Every structure is written in structure tokens, then in C-alpha cells.
């Protein structure tokens, strides 16, 4: 074993998650809504996938980072007004990292949530990213493209 490494079973991992001992989690997603909701599983009749431990992680971890491609294979946006897949958790996402952008979810209050475009991938402009995002992004603090 490498120093600092730990091995544990799923029972212990859920105890750590549910006990609030995890500071940050990184989850994949099918969709993220403008309100920071995450959908990362689907109904089996609509495709593969099922519920796993993501609900526990999303609900019991203070910082939730989502990593995903920005669009589907059909070029549909994955950052959307409202998730069309079953929700994993509501209002939990803090940061979205896609193949073209890094977007911070800013929770001013429950009625005032913004998606701040923090960074674009090389060769992408803020306008390019906005065109493939289904909701409005804010650009303050972003260098002009």
C-alpha cells in the first residue's frame, strides 16, 4: 500500500459518506440544471443505468463537482433549464467541469442562482460555450475572448 492510501468496504464507505466525513465528491452526470440539480441515473426502460451511491454523496458532501461532456452525442445541451432525467439530488452542484468549460454554480439564495463561466477550453470562446448551453451563463470575471 502507498502511504495515505486506505482500503475499505462499501459499508464503511457509506458510513463515511452518511456521517459527513467526505469533503468533496466528483460525480458524472447526464444533466445538470440551472438550479444546480443533478441527474446521473436513468430509468432502465429508457436506457442503461440505475441508482447507486451518488444520492448519498450529493446529499452529504459539502462540495459536489460534476464532470461530463458539455453535450450529448446528438449535440443536445447537458446543462439545461430543468433535468428531464430523474433527479439524483436538488441544488447540490458547486462546479461543472466539461470538455469545453468550467462553470461555477453560485447560490445567492434559492431564487437567485447563477452559472458563472470561469474558464473555456483552448480554442473555445464564451460565445461558443453559450451557444451549446441551454441556459444563460454569466461571464463576469472572465477575460474577454
Residue ranges and their predicted role:
Residues 1-145:
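Conserved phosphate- and dinucleotide-binding cores of soluble alpha/beta proteins
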